[in-house]
Amino acid sequence: MDKGVYILLLKNNECRILTGARGEISFSAGWHGYVGSALGPGGLSRVLRHFRLNEKRDKRPRWHIDFLLLSPCFQVMRAYCIHTSEKIECLLAMQMTGKVISGFGSTDCSCKGHLFYFADDPHEDILHLVSSISEKEGPSSHTDILVP
């Protein structure tokens, strides 16, 4: 599968989740957007792994996002995928408009975080963002929206 970056959009109830070494985090009811990279082996098939994990909740957590995917409080609504070989995950995270969940999903970079909270459905804003970045990446880049 192609390589790229993605935003996973989740809807959730108010809850508290133990997230490994980060400890317990309180999440307000609403929407969360997680910016991830799929430049390694398997590429964007990582998004399909996220869908499966959220549906079956049958594996141990490997990444920060897995703690949310394993919780019955969170449901994956869709994923926005940008097909690219460029490392633009942090660029995407810096342009997200939601409230950053500090330190979540950003242990391997200097970003404040890669998880963002929105009180209302941010679909239109995220769609505009990924379309804009995809255009800047040039003709070899394109965007898909996947639904579980």
Where do the protein language model's features map onto the residues?
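Aromatic/basic micro-patches that form nucleic-acid/chromatin recognition or nuclease catalytic surfaces
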Residues: 39-134
